[in-house]
């Protein structure tokens, strides 16, 4: 493999690692193995620390291909816990509400899950890693 010229690699990101942790550790080990001070390494999409799954990592000139991978169709598999909420919508923050779930049937859950199939336009929550550019127009004087 020619990591300096560019390679596309697939990693299974471990639980509790950030995407940055994975890239940083790989970059460190790779630069030591190749005996170079600096090597270009990037990833094609962030996974939350509490998510595990495939991360596409590119090296060298292959980092120019990141956009090709970043916006491809993705599949998510989730385990959920009904009846509890957190401010971050995941387990990174403490549970802030507990609600009864006895009335919820399997059929209702399966019906709701169908709304998550296909192309979905999402509004990222406040705790999202999504970068948003804010523009404020000058106010008239």
Per-range role (PLM):
Residues 139-141:
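Positively charged, low-complexity/disordered segments
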């Amino acid at each position: 493999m020619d990591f300096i010229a560019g390679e596309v690699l697939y990693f299974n990101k471990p639980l509790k690692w950030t995407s940055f942790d994975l890239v940083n550790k790989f970059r460190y080990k790779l630069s030591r193995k190749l005996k170079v001070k600096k090597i270009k390494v990037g990833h094609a999409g962030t996974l939350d620390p509490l998510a595990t799954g495939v991360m596409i990592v590119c090296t060298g000139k292959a980092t120019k291909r990141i956009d090709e991978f970043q916006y491809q169709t993705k599949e998510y598999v989730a385990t959920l816990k009904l009846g509890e909420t957190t401010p971050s919508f995941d387990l990174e923050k403490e549970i802030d509400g507990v609600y009864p779930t006895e009335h919820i049937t399997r059929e209702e859950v399966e019906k709701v899950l169908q709304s998550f199939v296909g192309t979905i336009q999402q509004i990222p929550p406040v705790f999202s890693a999504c970068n948003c550019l804010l523009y404020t127009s000058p106010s008239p004087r």
